[in-house]
């Protein structure tokens, strides 16, 4: 009887847009999968394996972005239409042949939690679902994602870190760059927190309360 060949664990690199580490994703070997968000094509040197554009078509219309371009410049829509890789979207879109509806309902039912405050959270949940279904993932590498701007810090960072914890709980290694603000903080009751960090946090909290 022929032995079934054991596949090597998958390595998935998430390509975000923060400039301090995003270009490092281009150093990934061809064996790594690249899962890219929004307009990461501006710096990627190869076609990603999957692309995620999970915003509504008229996102940021009130900020001057053109209608139907998903909150980006007009050429963004054209690139979506021409994408050779699957493009995960809220719904399958006829004008974008490679579009795939993101399976939100299935993932909420599977994980029993409706907690997705960023594209990165959606991505990590999909990775976990595939891993749980036997498509073994050994490592996730996170490039270009800091989540330290006002909105990201308060609304998105904790959620993405929650899903990172879910991955690590399954034995999946998660790597983040030293420059990223993810998974970093002083030890409670053991390390002094700098006044600069305290001031910054207080200012952010006050601004958040006044919204």
Can you describe what each PLM-predicted range is?
Residues 1-211:
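Metal-ion/cofactor- or nucleotide/acyl-coenzyme-handling active-site neighborhoods
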